């Protein structure tokens, strides 16, 4: 995408995606894992990623940033592993600037078909490792000030979905209420 400005990556992990961002973007990453963040810092240093402005240990449900801090907020493979995805979604919206975007990549469960059957059978095993295979997309549709503008299947095998939301400007949000 032709994004510009500042990006918050929630659940940055070891920083595997950091080299993929355009160098013009200012990147901040957060994760709960100190060990993962250390690996991300090493990656930033080794690759000379001067556009990465900070990597912080932080809870996605209690972001320590002021309102409207970022042009884009990205959360890849995060929503099914956090204890309160609705709270996290509200926090992502809060720190996104009006007119900015929230981008999620996540697994969302399938109601029907072979995939739905497999997901229901695998759920008890997946939950043992902290993953929710039965996760409806409605759990991220909780913010009145976020408008879904794109939804599509992504690799591998189309089992993940990218959802792109636009943060409504204050005037638009009030008019929509």
Where are the language model's segments positioned?
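Class I SAM-dependent methyltransferase SAM/SAH-binding core
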Residues: 8-62
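A short SAM/SAH-binding and catalytic strip from SAM-dependent methyltransferases
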Residues: 72-84
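C-terminal alpha-helical "lid/dimerization" subdomain adjacent to the S-adenosyl-L-methionine
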Residues: 103-161
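Short glycine-centered segments of the SAM/dcSAM-binding site in methyltransferase folds
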Residues: 6, 26, 99-101
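C-terminal lobe and adjacent flexible extensions of AdoMet/dcAdoMet transferase-like proteins
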Residues: 162-177
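A short acidic, Gly/Pro-enriched loop at the edge of an enzyme's catalytic core
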Residues: 58-73
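A short glycine-rich, Lys/Arg-flanked "PGG" loop and its adjoining helix->strand segment in the class I
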Residues: 86-98
